[in-house]
Amino acid sequence: MSQMENMAVPAVGNMSKEELLELKKAMNAKALAKRRTRTALRVTANVVFAVLILLPLLYAISIALMPSSELFTTELNLFPKNPTFSNFINAFRTVPLLRFILNSFIMAGCITIGQIITCSLAAFAFSFLEFKGKGILFMVVMATMMVPGEATIISNYLTVSGWGMLDTYQVLIVPYLTSAMGIFLFRQFYMTFPISLYESAKLDGCSNLKFIVMILLPLTKSAIGAMAVYTFINAWNMYMWPLLVTGSNNMRTVQIGISMLDSVDSQSITLMIAGVVMIIIPSISIFIIGQKQLIRGMFSGAVKG
């Protein structure tokens, strides 16, 4: 035994150094066993909760692959005995689902890009510029978050109808090109930067737009990622507004297409579930890809600001 070990473990009472070392090893082994037990219980609980959360999705995929003759029986069929992709094929044949998916991608993509641009510009003004009534104006913008969309949907419809914008991409995109939530998110992130950063850039002859594009946006990638994921998923899942302002299949979105799959025949449920499985793939993929950015962006401004 080295001199360091002799100094680190002195004899206590009637116990020798060797007995103390054995006691220390036993205590460490016991603590390690407890830690491993807690970890195993935690992992088991997480797996159980994950299975419970994924169970509806897994059962939906099972129904989508199940012939209607297997679904409507007295037996409880959790898994298809004869898996088939006919439900997916029939879903595309019943309604122009590809067109609906394209429309939803165009709408969600344009809304996402538009909100990132407008919200970042507004947040810059609220964070770095000084003007009369800035605090009151920001409170008014935040107050709009308390107004449900259903309360203004009729007035918005009358407005776009008077402008002749019905059944166009503009009517799907323009009303959602900005949001109070996005302004708040970017402002909280911008508030983490010192005002001296903006003042130094102005002294170097940097314009406001150049300061946003060249300095702010590269430093707020996590906020942009969080905003992009949040906005895209919300736009992809919109139902009431597209249903109200579109009338032709050329402008319908996927959420309306799913409701069109619900007919009176016995295959309607399997067709509808097959359509649901197809349209949730993009939103789930976007969420999985941008999950880290979403969490980081949502919490960074809250913690630092």
Model-inferred region functions:
Residues 38-305:
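A structural signal for multi-pass alpha-helical bundles of membrane permease subunits
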Residues 1-39, 71-93:
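Membrane-topology segments of multi-pass transport proteins
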